[in-house]
Every structure is written in C-alpha cells, then in structure tokens.
C-alpha cells in the first residue's frame, strides 16, 4: 500500500475512534436521564471509570490478551505489558490501539445502567477492571484477534464443522451481547431497587428524571455509531473501501430508523400512546442489531433487522421486568443483550454473500449460532463468578437507607443538582 493510502486509512481510523469515544458521553447522558436525579453523579462517575480503567488496563495487558500470539491453546493472547512492538499490522499500532480501546470501554459501559441506583461504587470498580482486563479481551481474541472462531483454515474447527467462520463486523456479539449478558447477570445479583416490585410481584414504574437528557444521549450514540460500524472497515482508501464504508453508513442508519419506528408504532398500538423512552431504546436496538452484519446485508435487510429488533425489544423489556422480575433501569439487557444476539443470528440469514435466505445453505447461520452461544456463555459464566463472588465476599449493594436517599452524596460527597 502506498504512503497516501496508509495515511488516509490511518486518519479514517482515528476519526472513527473519536466518534466511538463520543459514545461515552452518549451512554452517560442516556443512563442518567433514565434514572433518578439523586443518582446522577454516581452514573456519570461510573462512565468515567469505564473509560479511564478501560484505557489503562487495555493498554498494559488487554491489548496483548486480545491481539497477541496464541497461548493456552489459543484461549488467550500473549500479554504485552505495555509493549506494542508485537503488533505487525500495516496501520500504526498506536492508532489501532486507540480504536480498539474505545470499543473495550463501550462494552464495559453497557453494564452501568442495568446496575444503576444500588451498586457500591468500590465494587463497580472491580467489575470495570475485570471486563477491560480479562472478559472482553479473551472473547475478542477468539474473534477479532484471529482466534479459533474466525480461523478460516480448511482444517480448522469452524470450517470443518460449519464450512464457514463466525462473523461479527463491528460487535453485535463481541461488544454488545457481552455487555448485555453481563448487565443481566449483574442486575440479578443485585436484586431490584427498593419499591420496584410490590409484595404481590407487581412491577412499579420508577421513571427517570430527564427524558431530554436521555434523548440527547441517544442522538450522540447514534452519531458515534457512524464511527463504530463504518470505522471497523479500518480503511478508506481505494474503491473497495469507499464502497464498503458508504454501504455500512447506509445500513447502520436504516436499521436505526427502522428500529425506532417499529417501537414507536408498537407502543402506540399496545399502550394507546407512542412512548418516547421506549422509542429511544428502539433506535438503539436497531443500531445494536445491525452492527454484526452491516457489511453483509442489503439495505432492505438492514430495515428488516431494525424492524425486528425494535419489535422484539418491547416484549423483551416486558418479559424481563414483569415475568422474570429483573430490575434493569435502562433496559440494557434487552437493548444490547437480546438485540445483539438477534442481530448476529439474522446476519446468518440475511447476508447477501452467504446467508441462508439467499440460497447459500445453513452453514454460515450455524457458525453464527455457535459463535454467539460460546461468546455469551463465556460472558455469563464470568458474570456469575464475578458478581456473585463480590456479593458473597464484600457485598455488591449499598444499604437500603443510602439507596433511598441517593448515592450521590453518600458515595461521592456531591450532587449534580443544587
């Protein structure tokens, strides 16, 4: 590749990293808006921690775990201890590290909202460190790190079993479903907020304090997704990359608007009025769903994925809240977990190059099913050990009095609103 091409690709990758980083304030505003004002400083602090811890730990160790040479039979990569010389890609390693770091921070941040309003800040620090250091880099090594789930050698497990490899272009499974599964396990370990469920098991609504803030957060996340998905092409020079990036931009936006539209009309039909809060999550559901196959599906396929995710989201939130009695204040387990899984599976059906619905057989769909199963079982197992281990050893939840009065003053000694 010539110098101009490498320079253009590098600039595009760094610009995309900036957009993905901008998703952090999007998550912060969205989560804060969907929760009560007495916990806003705590929500914002946790989002800063995810970014700070994620950046440091991924630089020193996680980057090597994810992209280093295979050890332990390919289960994990060789830790780098802050040394970046092992990386052999064409693009500058520093730029690639930054791009991958903001993805790691995104996966960590997803859990914050599901565990909002009742988690000890000190124990959240432990979780944030473990996902950035261990959980995310290991499953990332199996996939984007060139590991066994994406090994296309003829004699590899995936090729010999399914005739295809697992595909997740920008992270429906690797980033979002992992965060969503961890969010669900964390919410289960914590238990519901005080007053969320009556003695008879009826779910009581606990409204967030600022839907305007949440709306702004979703718009910022939507913008950030234009770095998250198109940026995963990791190149912009040449006709192939120009076309690929443009296609991913289009499919990403179509899925977002389809998801939001489906949720808006469904809530209008079910509840008599279109719900703003659920429509916001519907947009995110479409974005999460398209992230795995935004490079492979057609524009019509993107609309279908968005519509399905926007509809399923509503029923997933109801089921988790009303039937399972799991208190997820922002719906993270439904948006990122359920829709991340759904989008990955639908990629296996709707991919124009090897999808089952395009006459290419069921091998690729099988690879997608197996990949998402392995990745989310890993996340669930780690989440159970981590959250229930913390709960047993140190306690995961604040005292009832602190929860009722708000975490801002007791955990941080200050409030966002005076």
Kindly give the residue locations of the regions a language model identified:
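Glycine- and aromatic-enriched membrane alpha-helices
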Residues: 1-418
